[in-house]
Amino acid sequence: MATHIAMPVNIVPELTLEQLRALPLVDEDFGTPEGAVLCLEAAYRRKSIEAVCACKNFMVEGTVALLNVDEDLAHDPEVRNKNALLTERAFRKAITEAWPDLKGVESFFTNRQAYHDGFVVVVEIRRSPDGKFTKHNHLVANTHSGWRVLNEVSDDELD
């Protein structure tokens, strides 16, 4: 179903911390892909599974996953509905069993690239309180209710 990305490894960002902090600020809202990522992270910090799920779109995420497996299945409404439900259930279980710890994490958005019509990948560099940096490639979709975060993709999927 969903692509599982290995735990992010520490990186050395191309920009200095001073340069990262000088990047334009992003509003925490669903008006931009980056804002949707910030909404998701804020919901993680509050440990609110309902707020987290409101930042995502499981129908779109599940359909993208089906397209990667079998295009015919992705066009079957019953299969898409069932897959969306299963994707959401699995996500809720995984998150509530192991909430991401984003306390004190700084987020910097360094790139946005087109992925497909209505989809972009937002590259986020996170700096943890211990000074380590990690890179995250968020697949984000423009939906009827604004931008929604789907899942992370690997660098290999972007090439």
Predicted regions and their residues:
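Surface-exposed, charged secondary-structure patches
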Residues: 25-29, 33, 61-133
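Short, low-complexity N-terminal intrinsically disordered segments enriched in polar/charged residues
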Residues: 1-49, 58-62
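Short beta-strand segments enriched in hydrophobic/aromatic residues
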Residues: 44, 56, 125-127
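Hydrophobic beta-strand residues in large extracellular and virion-surface proteins
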Residues: 37-40, 107, 121-125, 139-140, ...
